[in-house]
Each structure stands twice: as structure tokens, then as C-alpha cells.
Amino acid sequence: ELEGILITHEHVDHIQGLGVFSRKYEIPIYATPGTIAGIRNYKKLGNLPDGLLHEVDIDQPFSLGTLNIDPFAISHDANEPSGYRIDNGKKVVAVATDLGIYDYTVEHLKDLNAVVLEANHDIHMLEVGPYPYPLKRRVMGDKGHLSNELSGKLLCDILHDDLQYVVLGH
């Protein structure tokens, strides 16, 4: 059973099917106030009933069923983007994607059992690839995306014996 949908930020590649899915199954959506404002501004989602949208604040844990969820700030070019640390009392997982930089994110990623971590691009391939220069600059910027190399460094910073699963994603 799905008790809620956690949204990290309002970019289209993260919310494209949110309207239809949430309305069809009446599943609550949880996101920061800035992200919810961005979701409401994206007209292609259609009308989302206010009762389905729930604001969560950075560094203010909340409960969803048996889960304790701790939203944390991330560096990305969106309205108040977040990652999530999720604890069921036995295991702790985190979602940290769309990171431009990760310096202040590391503390939220310590002592995990599993993590979904961004590994977005090979720097050389991005530099010589077909994207226009402004997009390349955005992707490599402090509010863009984490390179594969920096993702590896972050993983080394949080690695410990109980970290059993690492899922690389965008």
C-alpha cells in the first residue's frame, strides 16, 4: 500500500505523471512549500485537490504511517528542493538526487542502510557532447547535477559496513 508520494522538486522529469497518478489513486503528495508552489504552477498536471498536497519543512521530521521522514536541503536549481531520509526504526534509507554540490548533504547521508544517490554524468562526455554550452554550464554548476566522479567521492564519504544497497540515479 502506498501512503504518500515524496517529491524532491518540481522539475517536469520528476512530476510528469504526478497529477494523473495522485488523482486516480487519491494518494497524498508531500513536498516543501517551494516545491508545491512549483507543482501548482505546472498547468499540464491538471487540478490537484488541496487535500492531496501536504507541505513539509526542511529539517522538520514528520511521520507517514510507520516511517519517520526527515526532509533535508539539497543544492539544485528548483524552488526549495529536498532529499529525504527515511527511517522505519530498523533501517534507514535516503534519496539524494539532483545535487549540484553535496557538502552540506553529507551529514544526512551518514549511517544509512541504503541510498538512492545521483550519478548524472561523465564530465568529459558532457564537455564534448552535443548539449549547448548554457545547458552544460547548468548541469556542471553548483545547482545542477552531480558528476559520476563526485558521486563516487560522496559515496566514499558515507560508506560504512551497514550500507548494504546503493542505487545510482538521476
Question: Each PLM stretch: what is its role?
Answer:
Residues 1, 56-114:
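Core dinuclear metal-dependent hydrolase active-site scaffold
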Residues 1-32:
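Active-site metal-binding motif and surrounding structural segment of the metallo-beta-lactamase
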Residues 10, 34, 74-77, 97-99, ...:
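Active-site metal-binding loops of divalent metal-dependent hydrolases
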Residues 15-16, 39, 124-125:
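Glycine/Thr-rich phosphate-binding loops of Rossmann-like dinucleotide-binding domains
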Residues 18-21, 39, 105:
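Hydrophobic packing residues within well-ordered alpha-helices of enzyme cores
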Residues 35-41:
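Short, charged/polar "capping" segments at the starts of alpha-helices
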Residues 42-49:
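Short, conserved SAM-binding/catalytic segment
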Residues 104-169:
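Cap/insert and terminal regions of metallo-dependent hydrolase folds
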